[in-house]
Amino acid sequence: MRKNQTASYQGNTIPWIEKLLETPIDDHRKNAVNLILAPYLINVRKVSYDAALNIINGWLSKCGELRQLDQDFNYMVRYALKYCAKNGNRPLKLETLKTKNLILYDLLKS
């Protein structure tokens, strides 16, 4: 990995994404699942589909305690996991998140 890249890998983990998995959020959950968590779990940590589904559903359950989920995320989570497995998508880098979704970035930095 080049020095100028912002993703900091420790084995098969990225610390800021691990922090996200431990941090329930009340908004931007769909973006977090599609652009960060599904690609991270499938293509970086390389957990199984079922394990990734359980991890994300557990995280969403904690998020739902802050603010009820607006919709049934089950289909969206399953689609995101299958899409990432098929296409090899990588999670957004933290710096890319800063430009694409500043609100989510700020939630993670606080």
Give the role of each language-model region.
Residues M1-N34, Y40-S110:
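Basic, alpha-helical nucleic-acid-binding regions used in initiation and control of genome expression
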